[in-house]
Amino acid sequence: MYSASVTAPVNIATLKYWGKRDKSLNLPTNSSISVTLSQDDLRTLTTASASESFEKDQLWLNGKLESLDTPRTQACLADLRKLRASIEQSPDTPKLSQMKLHIVSENNFPTAAGLASSAAGFAALVSAIAKLYELPQDMSELSKIARKGSGSACRSLFGGFVAWEMGTLPDGQDSKAVEIAPLEHWPSLRAVILVVSDDKKDTPSTTGMQSTVATSDLFAHRIAEVVPQRFEAMKKAILDKDFPKFAELTMKDSNSFHAVCLDSYPPIFYLNDTSKKIIKMVETINQQEVVAAYTFDAGPNAVIYYDEANQDKVLSLLYKHFGHVPGWKTHYTAETPVAGVSRIIQTSIGPGPQETSESLTK
């Protein structure tokens, strides 16, 4: 049996991907930017094994046997096998591309709870099989394969600050992830995640995207005017380590994304009352100067970015209301508990996929 294990990170978009121009290839209607979070707190661990004794491809996720028959997963496996077959010409090279695969995967966070589990999952799957197959392709090339599994997964193939360039080619060959800056560029950036709900969301992302593209009038303006300008401005803010500008663009883009969801017909609600309270709290924190930035993906959970220098200022107010829930690494004075948050995750910026000796197969 041949085996390889990899951990892959969660990434949280600061410039949102929402809308596909090609559903089967997962080609986006706009470019996006994300921050890769530390795998100490959020990661998917995947072990990929190949053996002549395996009768069929199988996947276990968090201990449960899952189907591999989805078109997205099949596209990833086919691309990876094709790349492996191209380096198997020598009679001495094991024909791994012809063997069935067993893939075992575990998250250390709730799956499908708005914490980008599919992104980490497909990034781990592609990275583990690429490692198993000893593929020579770089991460940008592999990101095109991960993209077919889950659009935002392509961004989890890099650490630090990442751009997914939408590309223009119909076959998607130029729709890939690239590094804007490594995690060492801005190591003092921190994130705190407020888990508002561990439940699966009412409107899955793919369904929501299709509805928005088909029915929202605001959407066309967002992808044609708003995002292209913001994309360049946000890259500059990251490279300049300009937190107030980065924060403003991040919050505005979160608002813009949820505005097109609301403008969809029927409207899509991802934020709930707790989410809105958190937005108000961040506005309170930022009254004197901008030191915190909220962003919400397709769900009610909040991610708040801040610089380590302002940690006490940012976390003390959040702790005041949410100090009673688990997950805190630092402690302040808790006064007025606000219901609606089940736990918090304090984290930082992290690297891309990492090879590990930890194996999920015996």
From Swiss-Prot:
SUPFAM superfamilies: GHMP Kinase, C-terminal domain, Ribosomal protein S5 domain 2-like. InterPro entries: GHMP_kinase_C_sf, Mev_decarb, Mev_diP_decarb, MVD-like_N, Mvd1_C, Ribosomal_Su5_D2-typ_SF, Ribsml_uS5_D2-typ_fold_subgr. Pathway: Isoprenoid biosynthesis; isopentenyl diphosphate biosynthesis via mevalonate pathway; isopentenyl diphosphate from (R)-mevalonate: step 3/3. It comes from the Eukaryota. It holds the Pfam family MVD-like_N. Homodimer. This is Diphosphomevalonate decarboxylase. It comes from Candida albicans (strain SC5314 / ATCC MYA-2876) (Yeast).
